[in-house]
Structures are given as structure tokens and as C-alpha cells.
From Swiss-Prot:
One of its GO terms (molecular function) is ATP binding. Gene3D superfamilies: P-loop containing nucleotide triphosphate hydrolases. InterPro entries: P-loop_NTPase (IPR027417), Thymidylate_kin-like_dom (IPR039430), Thymidylate_kin_CS (IPR018095), Thymidylate_kinase (IPR018094). One of its GO terms (biological process) is dTDP biosynthetic process. NCBIfam families: DTMP_kinase (TIGR00041). It catalyses: dTMP + ATP = dTDP + ADP. Pfam families: Thymidylate_kin (PF02223). Phosphorylation of dTMP to form dTDP in both de novo and salvage pathways of dTTP synthesis. GO terms for cellular component: cytosol. Signal peptide: none annotated. This is Thymidylate kinase. The lineage of its organism: Bacteria, Bacillati, Bacillota, Clostridia, Thermoanaerobacterales. Its EC number is 2.7.4.9.
Length: 221
């Protein structure tokens, strides 16, 4: 039995965590199927340890290459320990970030070569790709305004120019792979965004024999 892998992406402050929670709630109406909510970097004991190193504001000297390799290491453990086993059990996996975060942040944001990042992350994930990536797109000024200035981690403390590059990178990635991406205008009300996401996810699940007959897929959110 094969599960479904759905990833939420976007710059910090775009609302990924909120929309993931909305989708999780909608999916709970589907009886007889398990939904796993997770995040990366993190999701495993090793991954959470790496996450602390990556986001620690005391590590300001970290190079872009070190950052990219740490993310890939955490992703390798996350994929092997969490995602692949859950998909093999037929679960729906919802993840706050995955591979495209590295392409956007370390590739477009830090200026590292995309093909090198793809090579490293192919090793880390074994080529695993999400069935759907939901991109919460929000202007940088609006995203920064949503962040708590007293609780920003190392990456959230980057400048506006950095996040503009990351945002442009995400949009380029999405335009290059429209079949796997849903771009959501995160300036809209949260409920409107959630409805658009649920409509796309519902259509995705209806096309899967395992999920097509589940209660809750024929109606709205």
C-alpha cells in the first residue's frame, strides 16, 4: 500500500504551519487512514539535534556549504526513519518543509549551485519526491511583519534581500514543475487559503485507488 506525501513550503512567516494544521484537521474526517504531521529539519532525534545547530543564533559564522550539508544530513535521517516507513504503511504524510527548502534557501538565497544541491539531496532522499508541494507565497515585507522580532532564529534574522531571493527561487521552482506544485496567495485570509489547498488535495486523493472512496472526499472542507 502506498501513501501520499504532501509538503508545505514558503519563506519564514508565510503561514505554512497554520495551513498544515488546517489540512490536518480536514483530513481527520477521512476514517480508516492515518495522517502523520512532521517537520524538517527535525522529525527525528538526530534531526532535531541538527535543527538546533542550524537555527542557533550563536552560529553566525556558519558557511552556506555547512548549512546545506547539515540540512541534507537531517533530511537523510528524516526520509529513512520517518517518511518512507509512513508511506509504506499507506499513511498521508504532511511535512513542514522538505528538499525544495534547500534549493530555495541555500541555492537561491546563499548562491550555491543548484545542481550540486540536487546531487547531495538525491543521496539524502534516494530521489523521493512529494506528491504535492504547497507553496505559500507572500511578499517579504508582509512575512517579516508576521515574525516575532524577539524570537527570530538564525535564518529568520537574515535581511530582506536574502528573503527576496528565496521567494523568487520558490516561484522559479514552482513554475518549472507545475504538476507537483500548488501556489497559494498567502495574503488572502487563512480560511480562503485552506479551502484552496483542500480542493487540490481532495482531487489528488480521489485519483488514488487507496483513498478515492474515503468518507469526506466527496464534500467540501
Amino acid at each position: 500500500m502506498s501513501g501520499v506525501f504532501i509538503v508545505f513550503e514558503g519563506i519564514d512567516g508565510a503561514g505554512k504551519t497554520t495551513q498544515l494544521a488546517y489540512l490536518h484537521e480536514a483530513l481527520l474526517s477521512m476514517r480508516n487512514h492515518r495522517v502523520l504531521v512532521t517537520r524538517e529539519p527535525g522529525g527525528t532525534r538526530i534531526g532535531e539535534a541538527v535543527r538546533r545547530v542550524l537555527l542557533d543564533t550563536g552560529n553566525s559564522e556558519m558557511t552556506g556549504e555547512t548549512e546545506a550539508l547539515l540540512y541534507a544530513a537531517a533530511r537523510s535521517q528524516f526520509t529513512a526513519e520517518v517518511v518512507r516507513p509512513a508511506l509504506a504503511r499507506g499513511e498521508i504524510v504532511l511535512s513542514d518543509r522538505f528538499l525544495d527548502s534547500s534549493l530555495a534557501y541555500q541555492g537561491f538565497g546563499r548562491g550555491l549551485e543548484l545542481h550540486r544541491l540536487r546531487q547531495v539531496n538525491f543521496l539524502a532522499t534516494g530521489g523521493l519526491r512529494p506528491d504535492l508541494t504547497v507553496l505559500l507565497d507572500l511578499p517579504v515585507a508582509a512575512a517579516v511583519a508576521r515574525m516575532d522580532p524577539d524570537r527570530r532564529d538564525r535564518l529568520e534574522r537574515e535581511g530582506v534581500d536574502f528573503f527576496e531571493r528565496v521567494r523568487r527561487g520558490y516561484l522559479e521552482l514552482a513554475s518549472a514543475d507545475p504538476g507537483h506544485y500548488l501556489i497559494v496567495n498567502a495574503e488572502r485570509e487563512a480560511g480562503v487559503c485552506a479551502s484552496a489547498i483542500w480542493a487540490r488535495v481532495r482531487a489528488l486523493l480521489q485519483d488514488r485507488p487507496t483513498f478515492g472512496g474515503c468518507p469526506g472526499l466527496d464534500g467540501g472542507s
